[in-house]
Amino acid sequence: MTAHREAAGTAARAVGEGTRIVTLADRPDLVTAVPGVLDSRWPRFMLAGRPGHDVDLTDLLVRAPQHQVLLVDATDEVRGVGLSVPLEWDGSVADLPSGWDGAVTASADLLERGGRPNAACALSITLMPAVTGQGYAGEMIDALKRAAASAGAAALIAPVRPVLKARYPLVPMEQYLTWRTEDGEVFDPWLRLHLRVGGEVLGVAYPSMTISGTVAEWRYWVGMPLPGDGEYVIRGGLAPLTVDRAADLGIYREPNVWVVHREQI
């Protein structure tokens, strides 16, 4: 195995025995491992469908390597990724991007015109199943916050994908946000973690992410027949899939929750 040394003064940080978090700027050679991590957890349609933006996401992430964080184990295998992009944001709810797709589009435009970002937007934190539940999720949020701060950002915003929402796809996100545990905490554990480490809910982003495809493509992605027009509950979807067979089109419009981290940025 080839030995690698992270650049001094970067965001590289030990988070466990032999496990560390590095940025893509530290280890550009690890970019090829990112798709495999995403594929281990993301629903197939989120990776294969046509997104609601025309940005080459891999190119965008590579152009902002200091904003991408990787969880690397003792064998130098990538076990988790945290993806974020630079943005301009005035700090108000009104100036938030339209959602996940909007953040990707705005960041690509910013980099294309050479703008000066003052914020960062987290797109995803994804952990391989083998390391889930070991406390790394909070470390990855912290790593994205530190990466944002190192880049001069005043805030890290995120269109959060609540982890349990897929169990309740017919419940409006606004209603889902009001749910509480018996202890009075926010019901969703992923949102709850964001709040515990200093995040603040700003509101619902809808539609945050739009994915489209033909009826045949959707049938393959979701593994079920789609015999008529209308809405379908699909595995991994936070909201129903809408199918129009005459147009040979399926559209999935996902709601997310805007969260901002301002403290310690």
Positions of the model-derived regions?
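Short hydrophobic/aromatic beta-strand or adjacent loop that forms the aromatic wall/cage
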Residues: 66, 253-258
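Short beta-strand-to-coil "C-cap" segments at the C-terminal boundary of structured domains/repeats
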Residues: 260-265
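ATP phosphate-binding glycine-rich loop and adjacent ATP-lid/helix-beta elements
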Residues: 191
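Conserved acetyl-CoA-binding loop-helix of GNAT-fold acetyltransferases
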Residues: 133-150, 155-158
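Conserved acyl-donor/pantetheine-binding loop and adjacent beta-alpha core of acyl/acetyltransferases
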Residues: 83-124, 162-187, 205-227, 232-251
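Short amphipathic alpha-helix that is part of the acyltransferase structural core
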Residues: 2-99
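Conserved acetyl-CoA-binding loop of GNAT-fold acetyltransferases
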Residues: 195-203
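Active-site acidic-Proline motif in GNAT/NAT acetyltransferases
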Residues: 127-130
